[in-house]
Amino acid sequence: MGRNDEERLTADIIELARQYGRYGYRKIAALLRSTAGWVVNDKRVERIWRREGLKVPAKQPKRGRLWLNDGSCVRLRAEYPNHVWSYDFVEDRTHDGRKYRMLNVVDEFTHEALEIRISRRLKSADVIDVLSDLFILRGVPGHIRSDNGPEFVAKAVQEWIGAVGAKTAYILPGSPWENGFIESFNARLRDELLDGAIFYSLAEARIIVESWRRHYNTVRPHQSLGYKPPAPEVFIPVMGARSAPQPRPAAPTALAPKPILH
């Protein structure tokens, strides 16, 4: 590698480190290979990383999660795509101090973020609405894992999920580590986006969060997936052009009608 190549590589590393401030050198190396066309190993990136004084900012203590490395806390393990989904709520505020909620849905096997629905208020009817849209696009999963929040344990939600052929998997109360996949996703969302972003409107939040979700699925290297993104074939990001949706799995022939909630 000549001097000019070394300088260009260094510039690309610095730019990616600036753009993705929570990524370490291994994720940056994976991005260099997958999106920038570099043929470079982790050791060279690490050497430049250290020479330039780059580092991942220390996490705030409140981001810590209880998690067992062997996964022994997770009683139901996903064995194939659409086997187990998990979902959970995350709350944040726009610049004016008003609260909004996000309903996050993740496929535990592929690690793909299937949906992030954002609204000022999200109730059990919205849970059914989100799942209905996803079932049509993706098919019905075997199980849906969640905590015991009122929106998830609502009778209408349980009956509707059962009617379409899926099963609910509720974690023990006060045991968020049993929902480790979605908890980890929520932590990444906060760490990589929400903690450093100010949204002046709900519309802005929806646009930026959706952009982050697509990046998370199609570009972001995942250590647990060998530093590859979970779903590069779903959306192909093109600079300056709108991403083109790719074929989805066959939709179920029919879904149970949505219940009328009062």
Where are these regions (language model features)?
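Basic, flexible linker segments flanking DNA-binding modules
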Residues: 1-84, 175, 229-240
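RNase H-like two-metal-ion nuclease catalytic core shared by retroviral integrases
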Residues: 2-4, 146-160, 168-191, 201-210, ...
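Mobile genetic element proteins and their domesticated derivatives, centered on retroelements
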Residues: 13, 28, 45, 49, ...
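Hydrophobic beta-strand scaffold residues
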Residues: 56, 167-168
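Residue-level detection of the helix-turn-helix DNA-binding "recognition helix"
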Residues: 33, 50, 54, 162, ...
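Mobile-element integrase/transposase regions
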Residues: 38-106, 112, 125-130, 137-142, ...
